[in-house]
Amino acid sequence: MNNNNVYSLNNFDFLARSFARMQAEGRPVDIQAVTGNMDEEHRDWFCKRYALYCQQATQAKKLELEH
């Protein structure tokens, strides 16, 4: 994997985490619009990361509300 791909994945990961945080805060996120121009491989990877971060953000918010 070349450096450009690593940087792209880091950027996509940052975006997935950011959109998941927004979703957990109650802000509407249209993930189809976000991933609309991505090729299938990147869209699949991004959506999996987004789902993981949504789950983590939701769990963190629940823990925050419990304490």
Swiss-Prot record:
InterPro entries: GlgS, GlgS_sf. It comes from the Bacteria. It comes from Salmonella paratyphi A (strain AKU_12601). Pfam families: GlgS. Major determinant of cell surface composition. Negatively regulates motility, adhesion and synthesis of biofilm exopolysaccharides. Belongs to the GlgS family. GO terms for biological process: negative regulation of bacterial-type flagellum-dependent cell motility; negative regulation of single-species biofilm formation. Gene3D superfamilies: Glycogen synthesis protein GlgS (1.20.970.20). This is Surface composition regulator.
